[in-house]
Regions:
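A structural signal for short, well-ordered beta-strand segments
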Residues: 6-8, 88-90
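Vicinal oxygen chelate
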Residues: 2, 22, 31-34, 60, ...
C-alpha cells in the first residue's frame, strides 16, 4: 500500500527534536539515528567540522496510524539554509515505480526538480 510520510528539516537540532517526538508519541526510531560521520564522503563535498559530522543525516520515527516523520540537519556549511518553504517535505512512498513516475511527472509540471527521479533507494525524486 502506498504511504505518505513527512520530512522535517532542522538547522542543527534534529536529534533533540526527534527525541522529544519519541517521548510524546511513546515510540522508537525505525533505525538508529544516522549521522553525517557514518556516511561516505561524497567527491567535492566540503570539509566538515566535528560538530557538523555529528549532525543528523537521517532519522525516522513512526507516529500515528503508520505515519512516519523523518528529519535531517540542513547545514549552512554544506550550502543549505532552513527557510520557510524548505523546512517541511511531504514524501509519497509509492507501491510501484510506474506510480512513482506518474505522480512525479504530474506534480513536477511547472515546478522545479530539486532531485530528478532516480533509483538511489528504490526510486527517489524531489520537487519544489
Amino acid at each position: 500500500m502506498s504511504k505518505v510520510s513527512i520530512y522535517l528539516n532542522f538547522q542543527g537540532n534534529t536529534e533533540e527534536a526527534f527525541n522529544f517526538y519519541k517521548s510524546v508519541f511513546n515510540t522508537e526510531f525505525v533505525t538508529p539515528v544516522m549521522k553525517l560521520k557514518d556516511a561516505p564522503l561524497q567527491p567535492g563535498a566540503p570539509q566538515l567540522s566535528e560538530k557538523d559530522l555529528n549532525s543528523v543525516m537521517h532519522v525516522a520515527l513512526p507516529i500515528l496510524g503508520g505515519t512516519v516523520i523523518m528529519g535531517t540537519d540542513m547545514l549552512e556549511s554544506m550550502g543549505h539554509k532552513v527557510v520557510v518553504g524548505n523546512n517541511t517535505t511531504i514524501n509519497l512512498e509509492c507501491d510501484t515505480r510506474e506510480e512513482a513516475h506518474k505522480l512525479f511527472s504530474a506534480i513536477s509540471a511547472g515546478g522545479s526538480d530539486i532531485a530528478p527521479l532516480s533509483s538511489s533507494s528504490g526510486v527517489f525524486g524531489a520537487v519544489a
